[in-house]
């Protein structure tokens, strides 16, 4: 298998990944303790699956004991527009950059599978086995990414790189092949606090620590039912996710736009009108977000978010739209509608 690693990296870049590095499955011994502290503090909120699968997420060797190497890959989704600009348009909704294109789970996983098939053929004499993962299994991708040398976990807890900033999806290929690991990356955040200071909800109790219960991405995507009243005004017009801590990172001066056009933003999702989104029924919601990660939260949670944004808009013209949803069959939607009407002076 002489030269396999070099061929693998070259093939990964040909497939469209922006970086490919290797680590051992046991290269993240501190993850279990950090995850336990996160869960013990209650920072995971309603994400009970984080606690339920902690034994796997905290120790990748438990996920697949036969694995000898983890191939970590990064795929760019850098925006071609300023993701913060829409925050100054209160009558429009802000959707996280990663969800403005096609669902990355589908795009990246297909690419990982192609790379895995190539690896199995290239190293056929060793009869390798492979498993691919993209954010849907209990894999500590960010920690493995740092161990493999892709980048480091910044103060906002996301992975970032001096080569491509922090606009990247991560994917992993576990394999029974023994491939020489790369050196781990070290922290390059220095004294910078940009990501911590920009957070609208003060979701970072300390650098490198996130309280998901206050994170807008968690509140608009993972949180079921009504959002706590004191946090609603802080959502602004963010209706699916939040990019503030990512967008202000100075290392993004090296970021590149998405190479795969499927991950590029759909124009109709960069700054959609709140009035149009509030009117979506289930069928219209599924049609608009077909192939998008947004579809995963369903119409009710999405319209709930839209109504919070309407309430924060200061636009009296949107009051009637909110009032029409005060009797919505979904309790969280109806509650959000009543709150929006009250915020707009109704």
UniProtKB/Swiss-Prot annotation:
GO biological process terms held by the UniProt record:
queuosine biosynthetic process; tRNA modification
- Identify the catalytic residues: 135 (proton donor)
- Molecular-function GO term, any one: 4 iron, 4 sulfur cluster binding
Could you say which EC number(s) this protein's record lists?
1.17.99.6
Name any cofactors this protein relies on: cob(II)alamin; [4Fe-4S] cluster
Pathway membership: tRNA modification; tRNA-queuosine biosynthesis
UniProt-listed Gene3D superfamilies: 3.30.70.20
What top-level branch of life does the organism fall under?
Bacteria
Q: Name one GO cellular component term.
A: cytoplasm
Signal peptide stretch: none
The places in or outside the cell where this protein is found are: Cytoplasm
The note describing how and how many cofactors are bound reads:
Binds 2 [4Fe-4S] clusters per monomer.
What parts of the sequence cross the membrane? none
Database matches in InterPro entries: 4Fe4S_Fe-S-bd, 4Fe4S_Fe_S_CS, QueG, QueG_DUF1730
Q: Name one Pfam family in it.
A: Fer4_16
Reactions accelerated catalytically: epoxyqueuosine(34) in tRNA + AH2 = queuosine(34) in tRNA + A + H2O
Chief location: cytoplasm
Q: Which residues bind [4Fe-4S] cluster 2?
A: 199, 215, 242, 245
List, for all copies, the residue spans of the domain called 4Fe-4S ferredoxin-type: 179-209
* Subunit text: Monomer.
Protein family: Belongs to the QueG family.
| Function per UniProt | Catalyzes the conversion of epoxyqueuosine (oQ) to queuosine (Q), which is a hypermodified base found in the wobble positions of tRNA(Asp), tRNA(Asn), tRNA(His) and tRNA(Tyr).
Q: Which NCBIfam families match?
A: tRNA epoxyqueuosine(34) reductase QueG
Q: What is this protein called?
A: Epoxyqueuosine reductase
């Amino acid at each position: 298998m002489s030269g396999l690693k070099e061929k693998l990296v070259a093939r990964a870049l040909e497939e469209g990944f922006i970086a490919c590095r290797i680590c051992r499955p046991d290269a993240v011994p501190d993850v279990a303790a950090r995850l336990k502290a996160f869960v013990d503090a209650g920072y995971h909120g309603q994400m009970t699956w984080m606690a339920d699968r902690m034994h796997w997420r905290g120790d990748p060797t438990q996920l697949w004991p036969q694995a000898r190497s983890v191939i970590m890959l990064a795929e760019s989704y850098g925006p071609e527009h300023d993701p913060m600009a829409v925050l100054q348009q209160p009558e429009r909704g802000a959707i996280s950059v990663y969800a403005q294109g096609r669902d990355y789970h589908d795009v990246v996983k297909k690419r990982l599978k192609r790379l895995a098939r190539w690896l199995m053929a290239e190293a056929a004499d060793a009869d390798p086995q492979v498993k691919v993962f993209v954010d849907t299994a209990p894999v500590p991708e960010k920690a493995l990414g740092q161990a493999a040398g892709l980048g480091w976990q910044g103060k906002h807890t996301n992975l970032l790189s001096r080569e491509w900033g922090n606009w990247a999806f991560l994917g992993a290929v576990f394999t029974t092949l023994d491939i020489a690991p790369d050196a781990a990356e070290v922290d390059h955040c220095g004294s910078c606090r940009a990501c911590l200071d920009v957070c609208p909800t003060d979701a970072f109790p300390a650098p490198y620590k996130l309280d998901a219960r206050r994170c807008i991405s968690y509140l608009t995507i993972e949180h079921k039912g009504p959002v706590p009243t004191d946090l609603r005004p802080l959502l602004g017009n963010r209706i699916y996710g939040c990019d503030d801590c990512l967008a202000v990172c100075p290392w993004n001066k090296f970021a590149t736009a998405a190479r795969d056009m499927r991950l590029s933003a759909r124009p109709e999702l960069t700054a959609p009108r709140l009035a149009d989104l509030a009117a979506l029924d289930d069928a219209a919601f599924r049609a608009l977000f077909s192939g998008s990660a947004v579809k995963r939260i369903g119409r009710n949670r999405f319209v709930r978010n839209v109504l919070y944004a309407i309430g924060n808009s200061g636009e009296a013209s949107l009051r009637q739209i909110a009032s029409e949803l005060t009797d919505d069959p979904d309790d969280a939607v109806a509650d959000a509608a009543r709150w929006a009407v009250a915020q707009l002076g109704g």
